[in-house]
Amino acid sequence: MSTFKEMLQASFKSNDTEEWLDVHFTRPIGLVFALFWNKLGVHPNVITILSIFLGIGAAYMFYYTDLWHNVAGVVLLMFANFCDSTDGQMARLTGKKTLVGRVLDGFSGDVWFFAIYIALCLRMMYQYIPGTAVHWGLIIWALAVVAGIFCHSPQASLADYYRQIHLFFLKGKAGSELDNSDQQRAIYDSLPKHKWFARLFYFNYAKYCKSQEKRTPRFQAFFKEYLKISGEDAEPGNESLAVSKVRADFVEGSRPLMKYTNLLTFNSRAICLYITCLLNCPWVYLLFEILVLTVLYVHMHSRHEHLCETMLEELKN
């Protein structure tokens, strides 16, 4: 029988892409929940749905300005995140993976933050802008739109894309969820019209993949050349020495960028949100999203594209 430590390690995607806080806090708690729910026969999708309601509940609490409502919001969002970790760990450990699960998993975090942004705007719109006698009013809604749609969403999607790229070169196709828009569009086109749910998913997922590809032209050029020499299904340990060297060099160059992908996902946002809500200055969170995380995003993107340009030259030579 596997020990808890062995099961925890098996539930990780890779040590390179797991954040310190997740490894030592979120994932162990998530695994305890996963084992508990699995023993009761609860499906991972139910846990994902629970996380959505917990995230919406957290948003409701963040609407209020008093300390205890905000403490409750912190606790609810932490439990939503534990559930989000739990469903993925359960799916990986038990093999209970479904299309509905993929939809819910991608949907849940978006629902949390959509609700949170609305709650923060409703909370602040009648408050005064610090140092002035002017209410935030529509200004806070404009900040939330910029933070959520133009910053948060593209940052998180590109960070996820870079993680999946890293996992592909580290563990091969089987250890990654690196998809491309053409394949997803082909799946959509192949589905009969009565399978409307699957068609809706693959149509939107193809668009999501396309948005990632448009922002990474140098990676697309490098990856196209890489697949010419490696083949679509090459796996680590079952490839030529030349391909193995390219794979190893890419992983070596990509590994330092994983800290940026981690900073652009949940934990850094959540910690900033917790602190600013508890201190009753959640507008700082929106500025953190727009200014600090955008700088990290631009830096990460620039370095990754430079890495891909270097790797492309290595392939050509």
Spans of features found by a protein language model:
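Alpha-helical transmembrane segments
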Residues: 131-166
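C-terminal membrane-associated helical module and adjoining short loops/tails
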Residues: 1-29, 151, 161-317
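Select subsegments of transmembrane alpha-helices in polytopic membrane proteins
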Residues: 44-49, 105-113, 258-267
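Juxtamembrane membrane-interface segments at transmembrane alpha-helix termini
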Residues: 63-65, 83-90, 154-158, 299-309
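Basic, amphipathic juxtamembrane/active-site segments
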Residues: 75, 88-131, 135
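Helix-coil boundary and interhelical linker segments in multi-pass alpha-helical membrane proteins
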Residues: 59-72, 119-144, 277-286
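Hydrophobic, membrane-inserted alpha-helices
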Residues: 31-33, 53-59, 115-119, 144, ...
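Membrane-embedded alpha-helical segments that form the functional core of polytopic membrane enzymes
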Residues: 44-100, 117, 141-150
